[in-house]
UniProtKB/Swiss-Prot annotation:
Heme 1 (or BL or b562) is low-potential and absorbs at about 562 nm, and heme 2 (or BH or b566) is high-potential and absorbs at about 566 nm. This is Cytochrome b. The cytochrome bc1 complex contains 11 subunits: 3 respiratory subunits (MT-CYB, CYC1 and UQCRFS1), 2 core proteins (UQCRC1 and UQCRC2) and 6 low-molecular weight proteins (UQCRH/QCR6, UQCRB/QCR7, UQCRQ/QCR8, UQCR10/QCR9, UQCR11/QCR10 and a cleavage product of UQCRFS1). This cytochrome bc1 complex then forms a dimer. InterPro entries: Cyt_b/b6_C, Cyt_b/b6_C_sf, Cyt_b/b6_N, Cytb/b6-like_sf, Cytochrome_b, Cytochrome_b_C_euk/bac, Cytochrome_b_N_euk/bac, Di-haem_cyt_TM. It comes from Eubalaena glacialis. Coiled coil: none annotated. Binds 2 heme b groups non-covalently. Heme b b566 binds at H97, H196. The gene is MT-CYB. GO terms for molecular function: metal ion binding; ubiquinol-cytochrome-c reductase activity. Heme b b562 binds at H83, H182. Keywords: Electron transport, Heme, Iron, Membrane, Metal-binding, Mitochondrion, Mitochondrion inner membrane, Respiratory chain, Transmembrane, Transmembrane helix, Transport, Ubiquinone.
Amino acid sequence: MTNIRKTHPLMKIINDAFIDLPTPSNISSWWNFGSLLGLCLIMQILTGLFLAMHYTPDTTTAFSSITHICRDVNYGWIIRYLHANGASMFFICLYAHMGRGLYYGSYAFQETWNIGVILLFTVMATAFVGYVLPWGQMSFWGATVITNLLSAIPYIGNTLVEWIWGGFSVDKATLTRFFAFHFILPFIILALAIVHLLFLHETGSNNPTGIPSNMDKIPFHPYYTIKDILGALLLILTLLMLTLFAPDLLGDPDNYTPANPLSTPAHIKPEWYFLFAYAILRSIPNKLGGVLALLLSILILAFIPMLHTSKQRSMMFRPFSQFLFWVLVADLLTLTWIGGQPVEHPYMIVGQFASILYFLLILVLMPTASLIENKLMKW
């Protein structure tokens, strides 16, 4: 008799995706982040669901409802902080996952990569609208500043901003719709993640060498299920350490002050995971130019498959490209640091240099290094 997991219509899908899936035998721990992102998403949906049961999306009671969750609801404080710090863990895994894709040339699977870029935009949108919900000072002013960027769009800008606000400023209507968006978007992310996986399983996984591994595959279970469980345990441990010992480490103290439209915080800044893009936005003195640079800093990822000039897929055997990749990582860390600093000398000039270097690396230096490496292969 054939095993039920191979015959049952539903079990067959699970079997082909997580049990009998032929997987390259040499994929490293950098391939763990996909499953960790799935885990993060499930955790965020579950903690978010329980938070939504006690939260009120109204300007007069939103801040108080968060206080109520933390003080009066059974284990409400841990649910709230797991959700807030879970977002940080989500982005750590997301950036590691993208870095892996860049380094090992996983972007050659174009459909998978493009869905990934769409997923990144969706996750960023979800995190942004979610940050507005506690209705603290940084929530309010963050929402005001970021939505206001759309007014840079010629002709329709101002109308568009007021349409998104649902009025003439960030107010009750804005908060209510942002709550609705924050509730629906994770389910859209879940659907997109399934499509992402569907496209990946059409081609099979890449591996560190970038060479086809069809002749050397092993079943996903038990080899990679156990490896994923180890990754999951490390993720949960890190999240619990952060949540239980330093829950406010990554948050902004200003968000413990209720939103006040009459008083602007000294330094308006987003959460750490958006700081690199915020630094690029601020480094351009022109409003429309800044908005375009901000959009392009993420959208540039969609053009990476077209910028691949190397004859090799992975960077494993390409020292020049490896060096430039780590320069890019250092540059992004620099931008993240600059984004959290006030707009004054010397931070401004450092931010401008780092922003130019970011685009220069991706558009010019890395493709050029690949061409040089192609020439060196003929020696």
